[in-house]
Amino acid sequence: MLVIPAIDLKDGRCVRLRQGDMAAETVYSDDVPAVARQWQQGGATLIHVVDLNGAVDGEPRNFPQIEAIIRTVTVKVQVGGGIRSIETVRRYLGAGVTRLVLGTSALADRSFLEKACLEFPRQILLGLDARDGKVAVKGWTALSETKATDLLKELAGYALGAVIYTDIARDGMLGGPNLAALREVVELSSFPVIASGGISQVEDLRAVQSLGPRVEGAIVGKALYDGKLDYRAALAALGAE
């Protein structure tokens, strides 16, 4: 199972938010490429990057920083946040991004999701962000009436690469993942699942890994930046190193 470090970008800097609240940020670094380099040197094979401004505004806002990450590291980079058009998809993949995460657009514009999956099969991931079982959209600033489980069923035939499941209530809180919800997603999903939100210790990673081989990885952010979780130790514990 992959342990995937997260780089969340806001106003050109690496930050972390509490439960997706744009006003509750902690700035970790102004040197975004250096952060990416640090994770590559630590053993990461995939880095998860989120354009937080883009997620709210609906279009890329930190593209220069993401380009700088691509130029700096040789490992795979997946990007989410503000990807609402096929032109944006082509722009990112053309710049060297490996995979893209679609969230709001998967719910709001199914024809766009279809087109992206047809043009770039398995390079499009579903960002399934949920609070109390309902899908959140627009950078988590709005809650839809759609159940996360229903959306999974609807998208079963799409050429998605994976599903990233985030429990918003757990994100940035270091309280452990929502294993019950995650288990339901793993059982329902036709695609590999990546867990996100709340992971703070090796035991959390082992619990996620125990959900079976369909769990591709776990995204970790705050715990790494706050020093609560040592990245190399996490890799070693999961036998990933």
Regions found by a protein language model. Give the residues of each.
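Glycine-rich, proline-tolerant flexible connector loops at the mouths of alpha/beta enzymes
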Residues: 46-64, 104, 165-175
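Glycine/small-residue-rich loop that forms an oxyanion/phosphate-binding "nest" at active or ligand-binding sites
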Residues: 53, 58-118
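C-terminal helical cap(s) of enzyme catalytic domains, especially alpha/beta-barrels
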Residues: 111-119, 124, 209-220, 224-241
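Structural preference for beta-strand elements that scaffold enzyme active sites
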Residues: 2-6, 46, 74-78, 98-101, ...
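Conserved anion-binding
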Residues: 12-15, 19-24, 90-93, 97-171
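Charged helix-capping and loop-helix junction motifs
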Residues: 60-67, 110, 141-150, 175-184
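Catalytic cores of alpha/beta
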Residues: 70-99, 180-215, 234
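Conserved, mostly hydrophobic/aromatic
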Residues: 8, 39, 47, 79, ...
